[in-house]
């Protein structure tokens, strides 16, 4: 059974994922560190798992829990690289799907930017997340959900 796991510490599309999976039979798990604790109540198909605040603790838990039938939503290229061959789909919150063809280029870009920062340089960060970005993500996730439902 398909399950969506969200790297929930900084994910701007949590509510969209919850709304789009309601009554689909797809369960959602939001994994967050305790520093992002929330009392927010979610529908029955959604669970929240909290982990320690250590570096990459959320990532390690996602790798541990994910299976071949899962969809993982993360903006972390390093985590995505560990999962592209392990899970069904790895998505960015911009709607793009990570795969073995594009992940190396993304990791290389991350490395180059880290080297620039290490030398005191700066590089342009990502633009602010917009309503249009959210709409693009929702359309991408809906396509994924429909594809999965066709396979079931």
From Swiss-Prot:
Pfam families in the cross-refs: DUF188
Residue ranges crossing the lipid bilayer per the database entry: none
Source organism per UniProt: Staphylococcus aureus (strain JH9)
InterPro entries in UniProt: UPF0178 (IPR003791)
NCBIfam families: PRK00124.1 (NF001095)
Protein name: UPF0178 protein SaurJH9_0705
Family: Belongs to the UPF0178 family.
């Amino acid at each position: 059974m398909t399950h969506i796991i969200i790297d929930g510490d900084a994910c701007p599309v949590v509510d969209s994922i919850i709304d789009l999976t309601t009554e689909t039979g797809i369960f959602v798990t939001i994994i967050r560190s305790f520093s992002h604790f929330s009392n927010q109540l979610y529908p029955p198909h959604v669970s929240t798992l909290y982990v320690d605040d250590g570096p990459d603790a959320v990532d390690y838990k996602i790798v541990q829990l994910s299976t071949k039938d899962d969809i993982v939503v993360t903006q972390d290229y390093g985590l995505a690289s560990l999962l592209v061959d392990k899970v069904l789909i790895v998505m960015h919150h911009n709607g793009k799907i990570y795969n073995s063809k594009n992940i190396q280029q993304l990791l290389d870009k991350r490395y180059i930017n880290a080297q620039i920062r290490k030398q005191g340089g700066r590089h342009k960060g990502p633009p602010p997340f917009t309503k249009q970005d959210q709409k693009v993500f929702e359309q991408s996730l809906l396509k994924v959900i429909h594809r999965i439902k066709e396979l079931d």
